[in-house]
Swiss-Prot record:
CDD domains for the chain: Ribosomal_L13 (cd00392)
Family per record: Belongs to the universal ribosomal protein uL13 family.
Membrane-spanning ranges: none
One Gene Ontology CC term in the entry: cytosolic large ribosomal subunit
Annotated function: This protein is one of the early assembly proteins of the 50S ribosomal subunit, although it is not seen to bind rRNA by itself. It is important during the early stages of 50S assembly.
Pfam families for the chain: Ribosomal_L13 (PF00572)
Xref: InterPro entries: Ribosomal_uL13 (IPR005822), Ribosomal_uL13_bac-type (IPR005823), Ribosomal_uL13_CS (IPR023563), Ribosomal_uL13_sf (IPR036899)
Higher taxonomy: Bacteria, Pseudomonadati, Pseudomonadota, Gammaproteobacteria, Alteromonadales
Paired cysteines (S-S): none
SUPFAM superfamilies: Ribosomal protein L13 (SSF52161)
Protein name: Large ribosomal subunit protein uL13
Keywords linked to the UniProt accession: Ribonucleoprotein, Ribosomal protein
The organism's place on the tree of life at top rank: Bacteria
């Protein structure tokens, strides 16, 4: 018997809805990253995007444990000398609540073109409303 290799054209993708309210950031991000990669499927192939679409609602209500709300720092650089920027979790969740979950999931995906393609299937919304009711996403309990 030969090893099965999934073809990009034959992959069946589903839509899932995840409610992030009162969920721990890292735990929900690992489950989302696994689903985006397609590792939960029997036909998973490392070099093919076999993952599903994930719609996350209530991203503003995600939480972190311990003192990470003040202590977790996100860094970015403007690429100019002295251009290192930093912002705490507490301030970033107020300023751009969707970015917190996006940063966590993106760091768990492969780096390169395949990882960017997987990341495009993640749709994050700060509140309970989303624009994907036409796709009829299934509720995913994590």
């Amino acid at each position: 018997m030969k090893t099965f290799v999934a073809k990009p054209a034959s992959v069946q993708r589903e839509w899932f809805l995840v409610d992030a309210e009162d969920k721990t950031l890292g735990r929900i991000a690992t489950e989302i990253a696994t689903r985006l990669r397609g590792k939960h499927k029997a036909e998973y192939t490392p070099h093919v995007d076999t993952g599903d679409y994930i719609v996350v609602i209530n991203a503003e209500k995600v939480r972190v444990t311990g003192n990470k709300a003040k202590g977790k720092i996100y860094y970015s650089h403007t690429e100019f000398p002295g251009g290192l920027k930093q912002i705490s979790f507490e301030k970033l969740i107020e300023k751009a609540p969707t970015r917190v979950l996006e940063f966590a999931v993106k760091g768990m995906l492969p780096k390169g073109p395949l990882g960017r393609e997987m990341f495009r299937k993640l749709k994050v919304y700060a509140g309970p409303e989303h624009a994907h009711t036409a796709q009829q996403p299934q509720l995913l309990e994590l």
